[in-house]
Amino acid sequence: MVDNKLFPTFPTPVILYNFGKDSHDLNVSLVNDILKERKSDDDGRVASNMGGWHSILKMEDRYDSFKTLRDKIEECSNDYCRQTGHEDGLIVEKLWANISGPADINMPHHHGASALTGVYYPLYEMVDGEMKVQYQENPKLLPGSWDGKRGGSVVFHDPVYGQKIRLRKTKDVSPFTIEHYHLYPVS
């Protein structure tokens, strides 16, 4: 099992799992497979992303690296259930990848029928054509790292965000053209 740290600050506890240096080969494989997938499907799909690239779902069916990651996530997900007093036996599926650059964002959203959702960040930088990865023994959740070198902000939203709202029908509206959201309660 990987190192983990429970943050019981929220009604739904957050646990940070650190795979550390042992995940180096997996990280290299994941990044290479993600870049290979992007090369084969440069447009990707549009979901909550505004800018950036979003792969197809079920990457674990296409790449061994994602199958390995899925197994690790499934182990951590069931550990999360045990630590927080829930029944384990979760099955992890439908993994995907996002590539985001400067000014790319993902709009707040929820993942429908998912029991848990999480994110795995294989952060790296290319130096002289070689992938370099820094591993921290005790990473901290630090919202507001705006320099782009350590990733973006961590923002927590209410898990039921958007479930009982609707957007008024307006001509020519898409996630890329709308300037204001007008939210109306659904009774």
Annotate each language-model stretch with its function.
Residues 1-84, 105:
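Non-heme Fe(II)/2-oxoglutarate
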Residues 19, 43, 50-51, 88, ...:
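Feature targets compositionally biased, intrinsically disordered low-complexity regions
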Residues 85-95:
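A short coil-to-beta-strand element that immediately follows conserved catalytic motifs
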Residues 94-186:
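Catalytic core of non-heme Fe(II) oxygenases with the double-stranded beta-helix
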